[in-house]
Curated annotation (Swiss-Prot):
InterPro entries: ChlB/BchB/BchZ, Nase/OxRdtase_comp1, Nase_comp1_CS, Nase_Mo-Fe_CF. One of its GO terms (molecular function) is nitrogenase activity. This protein may play a role in the biosynthesis of the prosthetic group of nitrogenase (FeMo cofactor). Keywords: Metal-binding, Nitrogen fixation. It comes from the Bacteria. PROSITE patterns: NITROGENASE_1_1 (PS00699). This is Nitrogenase iron-molybdenum cofactor biosynthesis protein NifN. Belongs to the NifD/NifK/NifE/NifN family. [7Fe-Mo-9S-C-homocitryl] cluster binds at C44. Pathway: Cofactor biosynthesis; Fe-Mo cofactor biosynthesis. GO terms for biological process: nitrogen fixation; protein-containing complex assembly.
Length: 461
């Protein structure tokens, strides 16, 4: 059981955490025809847009209420109403997701109450779903903002149902913030292989997967349809991936009587096997499909090939709790050792389940310091960790958000049998790529072992 330790430094160096409003915005972008709206200053939104555009390499429709000195003091209700009007006129969205920021939450504004009054008064807003979530920058991180946004979407858009009328082939898939678009695709592929039809919430795999559109649009292109969210009560079960989705799943059960299963991770043999067993149970299959069996056999072979490099490997990792837990447990199952673990938020039950003695709530400065002291051999974190990797002369495996110095970050897959196989290869290849540079002390300057320290005598004739 890991112990959570708070970093006791007077400043943050090279931050690891991404803010909660940005996590909420990413969840909103997984809804079809959506426009995320930050209730705060223009700079908050501009900074978020830069992060999203650099990571996904796509245009992102992120809007702001543009709070100024006067509206911050007197209240920003008028700003919200004006922003929604402008967005509806210019982008014609089906969904507007509002995320508060540190500015408005520090003031203590009753955004939810103001929004309810607006929706009663503004009958012309009919046809545009508006959802609000409280996400101050100073509380939690990206994972927390994503989870709160999903919970708000469920509370606002999933109908309350008194009686069950399930479609036994339909399942609801709640995905975590750490899933890439390729990982959502892989989870959907695995579910469909068993003859099941998933409703993904939120679905970034069809909105931020990097596809060309014929026309420009001011809202998200793709994502979970509002009609599909309304059909969630007919699902046979809710499959929640990641500890961050543990609160949203029972909300669906309370509203629509849909049972749920929570999977803390989908990276590694045991957890994927457990996921497949549930899919077999839901589909009524006695054996997995041949393609699934083949994927499992390939993953097992990859584990055999990679264990020469992962056995005894000393790993330093910095990530959100769900991603940190998923990658760490998979590596420990391959014989690696987590010597440094730094995370972004304390709001996760997975922290104490980490396969290490200590988890630090800190930044990349803590990652660099801990990795150096523990003599780590590899570093796993997002692109901002490249400075620590260079300083320590360690290979860097980029994981998490943001990844801006590589193209195709959204196409990385580390879940399921296929993704776990790719992850093992990724780690092994990162270690193989380290080239040893000979130094003088490796040769003549090195001490000679005592058993070889002797004067040779000529052999008698």
């Amino acid at each position: 059981m890991a112990v959570l330790t708070h970093s006791r430094r007077a400043l943050s160096t090279n931050p690891l955490k991404t803010s909660a409003p940005l996590g909420a915005a990413m969840a909103y972008l997984g809804i079809e025809g959506a426009v995320p709206l930050f209730h705060g200053a223009q700079g908050c939104t501009a900074f978020g847009v830069v992060h999203l555009v650099r990571h996904f390499k796509e245009a992102v429709p992120l809007q702001t209420t543009a709070m100024n000195e006067v509206s911050t003091i007197l209240g920003g209700g008028e700003q919200i109403e004006e922003a929604i009007d402008n967005i509806r006129k210019r982008a014609n969205p089906k969904f507007i997701g509002i995320a508060s920021t540190a500015l408005t939450e520090t003031r203590g504004e009753d955004i939810a109450g103001e929004l309810r009054a607006m929706q009663v008064r503004r009958k012309d807003w009919v046809g545009t779903a508006v959802v609000h979530v409280i996400t101050p920058d100073f509380e939690g991180g990206q994972q927390d903002g994503w989870a709160k946004a999903v919970e708000a979407i469920v509370a606002a858009l999933v109908p309350v149902t008194a009686e069950r009328d399930p479609d036994l082939r339909q399942v609801t898939l709640l995905v975590p913030s750490c899933f890439t678009t390729a990982e959502i695709d892989e989870a959907v592929r695995m579910i469909r292989a068993f003859g099941l039809s998933p409703i993904v919430l939120p679905d970034l795999s069809t909105s931020l997967d990097g596809h060309l559109s014929d026309d420009w649009s001011g809202h998200s292109l793709g994502g979970t349809r509002l009609d599909d969210i309304a059909r969630i009560p007919r699902s046979a079960v809710t499959l929640a991936i990641g500890e961050q989705m543990r609160a949203a799943a029972p909300m669906i059960e309370d509203r629509a009587l849909v049972p749920y299963r929570v999977f803390q991770s989908l990276t590694g043999l045991k957890v994927v096997d457990a996921f497949v067993r549930v899919l077999m149970e839901l589909s009524g299959m006695q054996d997995p499909p041949p393609s699934t069996k083949r994927d499992r056999a390939r993953m097992m072979d990859a584990a055999l090939d990679a264990h020469f490099f992962t056995g005894g490997l000393r790993v330093a990792i910095g990530a959100d709790p769900d991603l940190m837990f998923a990658l760490s447990t998979a590596l420990v199952s391959m014989g690696a050792e987590i010597v440094t673990a730094v995370t972004t938020t304390q709001n996760s039950a997975l922290i104490e389940k980490m396969p290490c003695a200590e988890v630090i709530l800190g930044d990349l400065g803590d990652v660099e310091r801990g990795a150096g002291q523990a003599e780590a051999q590899i570093l796993i974190t997002h692109s901002h960790g490249r400075h620590a990797a260079a300083a320590l002369h360690l290979p860097l495996v980029r994981a998490g958000f943001p990844i801006f110095d590589r193209i195709g970050a959204q196409d990385t897959c580390r879940i399921g049998y296929r993704g776990t196989r790719a992850f093992f290869f990724e780690i092994a290849n990162a270690m193989q790529a380290i080239h040893h540079r000979p130094r003088p002390e490796d040769f003549g300057a090195a001490p000679i072992p005592q058993e070889f320290d002797h004067v040779p005598h000529p052999a008698p004739c």
